[in-house]
Structures are given as C-alpha cells and as structure tokens.
Amino acid sequence: MINDIADLIKIQSKNIEHYNKYPIALLLFIMLILEVPSSFLSESNESSIAFDLTFNLLNALVLTFIEAILFVYWFGRIGKNHSFLSFLRYDAMLSIAANIPVIAILLITQNFEESSWIAIIGGLIAVSYIIYMFSVNLALATGSSGKYAFGAILIVVLIQLIYGVLI
C-alpha cells in the first residue's frame, strides 16, 4: 500500500482496478486518521478543535462518497465503467496521497502568519498540486483524457466549494 501511495504522490497511477485489493474500511480509516493532523495544523480561532476535527472528519467522509458517485457517472458517460466501490477505493487512496504533502506544507507554513506571503503561496502550491495530481492520476487510472479527468476534478472542486458555503 505504501508503494501505491508513493506512486500516486509521484503521479504514476495504476489502473483503477489495481486498488480493489485494499479493504475499503482500511482506506477510509487511514484517510480519516490523516484528517486529524490537518485539523490541528489548520485550526481556526473561531471554533474549538473538537468541533473542527469532527466537522473535518464528517466532511471528508461525505465528500469522498459524493466524489465516487460523481466519478461513476462522469466516466460512465464515456464508457469507462467501473463500480462505485472501485471509485470509492481509488478516491480514498488519492485523498491519502494528497493529505501527505498537504500536512508537510501545513507544518512548514504554520510558523508564519496566515496573511504572510509564505502561507498564501504555500496554500496555492498545495491546492494547485492536489488539482494536478488528482487530474493526471484519474486520467491514468481510468484511461481517459487529461482534459476529461480535469473536468471531473473541477466539478469536484465546485461541489466542495458549494458544500463548504452551505455547511
């Protein structure tokens, strides 16, 4: 599993069915465990850490299921039919792979004020890398074009923004 996560970080995804060998419960558990340091490192002053942690854990779980549903529909439109559980496993693996560099960036930028250029640039680098990593890996895993996978990721980002505003 560690090699597969490292490959995803290096943007060298295997076919989506390759990741079906991992139990979904384990993947979701690891994904949620990695939300804990993210919550502590990016805690806001407006609420308690317990609230932030609970909120982030629920968000991660709900959005992972929503993303898997979207991917089943989106890639099914072009004949790249994979099961919901395949996309759920793959999305959980991508989330694990994305959280590792984000935690590293949060560790580096936590010593700077939120309004400093270093924190802003670090945040932009993290967001850009995640969008790029998700898009390219998704294209490689499904055998679709990079533009089509990028469209799916843009829809995911839009859903996350709307979800974040409504909640």
Label each region the model flagged.
Residues 1-90, 95:
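Selected alpha-helical membrane-embedding segments in polytopic membrane proteins
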Residues 39-47, 104-112, 165-167:
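Juxtamembrane "helix-exit" motif on the non-cytosolic side of transmembrane helices
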Residues 49-56, 86, 113-123, 149:
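Non-cytosolic membrane-interface motifs at loop->transmembrane helix junctions
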Residues 61, 96-104, 124, 161:
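Mid-bilayer segments of alpha-helical transmembrane spans in multi-pass integral membrane proteins
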Residues 91-114:
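C-terminal halves and exits of single transmembrane alpha-helices
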